[in-house]
């Protein structure tokens, strides 16, 4: 039997291919199930879940930018109970689709409460920890910008979680390396990166920011070079697996993420412009890998990581 060249294995996740719709760009999968069989995907990162329902920020929440978009959705979601009782059971009809649950909160207790429960869902195989949220107990500073706070949060959720934890790193920091190292010391099983870059657009007629929240997260092709740089940086100091994301829209983008040090790839904003983007990437990968002399993604991951170790 021929080995699947697209298969990758990372903590908690045995993936038939590395393509994962990113959290916040795929809802809870229901909308995209009308377009194609979700079982084709490697995994799904579902929308952020908080202990209680959140209604999000006032509108407008989205603004177009050259080669990207700004969003300030505000973690709108139905809350943990609805996700557990309604959203996740609907995805159980896809037996070959491991779910990564994205968890967010306003304080450490929020994260602990959600992580303790959500991993008990039979199809949730890993948790993605969104640490770009403001910490209300510490003046609203994001959890992911302070190594000590990030360490404590990671350690706290690891104590209660029954599935591996992937911490989502923010690019809105001076130096990402000490934060990644603190998270690894806290017991994380891997990283997902990068989250959005903070940005703003101004309406020339009103002379005010377009977004009601004023600032929003920049995503799309514009941020890919930033993602590649930061993935490479983190991969050079840590052996933990990385789910790379940020501006992926082509097969070459996927392979570039792997060559930077990723072990799987998240696809976000591209889902809005082409609902079929994930199946297209999965279909296109084998041919491009053959052209580039890549036997398998597992082999590519091994070669890249060994090269980075030798370069230290």
From Swiss-Prot:
Origin superkingdom: Bacteria
Name of the protein in its database record: Dihydroorotate dehydrogenase B (NAD(+)), catalytic subunit
Kinase found in the keyword field: no
Oligomer status and interactors: Heterotetramer of 2 PyrK and 2 PyrD type B subunits.
Residues at which FMN binds: 23, 47-48, 102, 130, 168, 194, 220, 246-247, 268-269
Pfam short name (any one): DHO_dh
NCBIfam families from the UniProt entry: PRK07259.1, pyrD_sub1_fam
Active site: 133
Gene Ontology BP term (one): 'de novo' pyrimidine nucleobase biosynthetic process
UniProt cross-references to Gene3D superfamilies, sorted A to Z: Aldolase class I
HAMAP family from the UniProt entry: DHO_dh_type1
Presence of the UniProt keyword NADP in the record: no
Reaction catalysed by this enzyme: (S)-dihydroorotate + NAD(+) = orotate + NADH + H(+)
Cellular location(s): Cytoplasm
Co-factor requirement: FMN
Pathway connected to this protein: Pyrimidine metabolism; UMP biosynthesis via de novo pathway; orotate from (S)-dihydroorotate (NAD(+) route): step 1/1
GO CC annotation: cytoplasm
Function: Catalyzes the conversion of dihydroorotate to orotate with NAD(+) as electron acceptor.
The record's free-text note on cofactor binding: Binds 1 FMN per subunit.
């Amino acid at each position: 039997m021929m080995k699947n060249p697209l298969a990758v294995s990372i903590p908690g996740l045995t993936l038939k291919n590395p393509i994962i719709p990113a959290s916040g760009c795929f809802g809870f999968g229901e909308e995209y199930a009308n377009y194609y069989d979700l079982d084709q995907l490697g995994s799904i990162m579902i929308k952020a879940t908080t202990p209680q329902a959140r209604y999000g920020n006032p509108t407008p929440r989205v603004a177009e930018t050259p080669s990207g978009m700004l969003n300030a959705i505000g973690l709108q979601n139905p809350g943990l109970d609805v996700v557990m009782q309604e959203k996740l059971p609907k995805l159980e009809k896809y037996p070959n689709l491991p779910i990564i649950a994205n968890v967010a909160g306003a304080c450490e207790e929020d994260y602990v409460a959600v992580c303790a429960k959500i991993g008990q869902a039979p199809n949730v195989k890993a948790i993605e920890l969104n640490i770009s949220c403001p910490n209300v107990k510490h003046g609203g500073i994001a959890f992911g910008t302070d190594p000590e706070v990030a360490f404590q949060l990671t350690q706290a959720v690891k104590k209660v979680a029954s599935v591996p934890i992937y911490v989502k790193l923010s690019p809105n920091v001076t130096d990402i390396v000490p934060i990644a190292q603190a998270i690894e010391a806290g017991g994380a099983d891997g990283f997902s990166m990068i989250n959005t870059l903070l940005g703003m657009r101004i309406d020339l007629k009103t002379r005010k920011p377009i977004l009601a929240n004023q600032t929003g997260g920049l995503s799309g092709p514009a941020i890919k070079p930033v993602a590649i740089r930061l993935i490479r940086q983190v991969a050079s100091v840590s052996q933990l697996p990385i789910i790379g994301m940020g501006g992926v829209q082509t097969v070459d983008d996927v392979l570039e993420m792997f060559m930077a040090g990723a072990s799987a790839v998240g696809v976000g904003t591209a889902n809005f412009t082409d609902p079929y983007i994930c199946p297209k990437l999965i279909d296109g990968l084998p041919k491009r890998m053959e052209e580039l002399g890549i036997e398998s993604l597992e082999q590519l991951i091994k070669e890249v990581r060994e090269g980075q170790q030798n370069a230290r």
